[in-house]
Amino acid sequence: MIASKFGIGQQVRHSLLGYLGVVVDIDPVYSLSEPSPDELAVNDELRAAPWYHVVMEDDNGLPVHTYLAEAQLSSELQDEHPEQPSMDELAQTIRKQLQAPRLRN
């Protein structure tokens, strides 16, 4: 069983670039189509670790979907980000949806 370090709705930072993002989905291992060596220069160990679908903002404040290895992410310690309120809102919305009971007819 593979354990993930981050959860859906959690705010994270790109370790190298410092961008703030929100985890929207998790894959236990790399699960996009098999990349060519030029497209993804990572080893098999990295591909076997969890990968995250993360929404981040580009320099213009527009949302960007990224697919990142666990090793590329770090925990975000702050809960509020006045410079990027949309990331805070997205994280809160996802967490509320995960906690809200689902009514079945």
Curated annotation (Swiss-Prot):
Keywords of this entry: Cytoplasm, Stress response
SMART domains, per the entry: YccV-like (SM00992)
GO MF terms held by the record: hemi-methylated DNA-binding; identical protein binding
SUPFAM superfamilies (alphabetical): YccV-like (SSF141255)
InterPro entries: Hemimethylated_DNA-bd_dom (IPR011722), Hemimethylated_DNA-bd_sf (IPR036623), HspQ (IPR022866)
Cellular component GO terms, alphabetical: cytoplasm
Protein name: Heat shock protein HspQ
